[in-house]
C-alpha cells in the first residue's frame, strides 16, 4: 500500500495536534507545582527564622554550621528524619497509625487553594473560600486523634484528645470572626475580601473596622496552630510528646511539617482578612492601577503583590514566634475556659454588633 505525501502530512499534523493536547493537559499542573515549591521554601525559611529569633531571645548563637548562617539546618534535619527507621507500635492500629499524619498534612495543604497570594494569583477563587478553609482545617484534628488513639499509648491518646478539644474550643470563635469579616465585605470569597480593603490603603484594612475580631482571631489562630502558650496536646513535661510520642522517621517529620504549615496558613489568612492582602499600604497609591499594558507588567504586578502579602504574613510569624519564647504554657482548664467563657462570648458579641451596623447602614 502506497501512501502519498498529502496523507503523510495529514498524519503528521494529527500527531502534532495530539502532542499539543497532551502538553496543554499538563500545563494546569504548573501552578500547583509552583505553589508546592513556594510552600517548601517558606517552611524552610520559617524554621530558620524561628531558630534565629529564639536564639536571639535566649542570647544564644543559634544554627551556624549547616550552610552560611545555618540556612541549611532545616534541610539537614529533614534529611535525617527521612533516613531514620520508621518504627511501628507492636500493639497499635497500624492502618490508622500510618494514615494519621497524611490526613493532617493534606488538610493543611488544601487550605492553600483559596489563599490569594498576589494580584490574580489564587488557585481557586471560590464564592465560599473562607468557609472552605474552616471546613478543611477542621479535618486536621481528626488525623491527630487517629494518631493518638492508634499508638496504644496513654500519653499519645491524651494528646490526641487534647488536640480535638482544643480545636473545637477555638474553631467556633474563629468562625464568628470570619463571619464578621464576610458581612463587612458582602462576600465569602477571599479575593473579594481583599478587594474590599483596597480603596483607602492602610486605613481601609479590616484591622481598624474589626479590632476586637482581630485580637480574637489572632489568639484563636495561635491555639489552632498549637503554639505556646497553647501547646497542651504535646506538652513535654506532661505527655512526653503527646500524639507524636510513638512516631519516628518520616511520619514524625510530617507532624513537624504540619505545625509550620499551619502557622504559615494562619499568617496568610491574618493578612488576607485583616491586613489588606496584596494591597499597597499607602492610601490612593496602587501599583496595579498604573500599568495595564502587557503581560510582563502583569507578571511584575503579581510578583509585587506576592512580596507585599508575604511581608505582612511575616509580621504575624514574628509575633507568634516571639510569644512562643516569652509566655509560659497554660493549664488545660485555663485553655478551655479562655475559649468557651471568654473568646466565644466576645466573638459572638462582635458578630452581632457587626450585623447590627450592617443592617442600620442599609
UniProtKB/Swiss-Prot annotation:
The chain crosses the membrane at residues 27-47, 103-123, 128-148, 164-184, 202-222, 247-267, 303-323, 335-355. It is an enzyme of class 7 (translocase). Signal peptide: none annotated. It is found in: Plastid, Chloroplast thylakoid membrane. Its EC number is 7.1.1.-. It comes from the Eukaryota. It catalyses: a plastoquinone + NADH + (n+1) H(+)(in) = a plastoquinol + NAD(+) + n H(+)(out); a plastoquinone + NADPH + (n+1) H(+)(in) = a plastoquinol + NADP(+) + n H(+)(out). GO terms for cellular component: chloroplast thylakoid membrane. One of its GO terms (molecular function) is NADH dehydrogenase activity. The keyword Transmembrane applies. Pfam families: NADHdh. The keyword Transport does not apply. Keywords: Chloroplast, Membrane, NAD, NADP, Plastid, Plastoquinone, Quinone, Thylakoid, Translocase, Transmembrane, Transmembrane helix. Belongs to the complex I subunit 1 family. HAMAP family: NDH1_NuoH (MF_01350). NDH shuttles electrons from NAD(P)H:plastoquinone, via FMN and iron-sulfur (Fe-S) centers, to quinones in the photosynthetic chain and possibly in a chloroplast respiratory chain. The immediate electron acceptor for the enzyme in this species is believed to be plastoquinone. Couples the redox reaction to proton translocation, and thus conserves the redox energy in a proton gradient. This is NAD(P)H-quinone oxidoreductase subunit 1, chloroplastic. The lineage of its organism: Eukaryota, Viridiplantae, Streptophyta, Embryophyta, Tracheophyta.
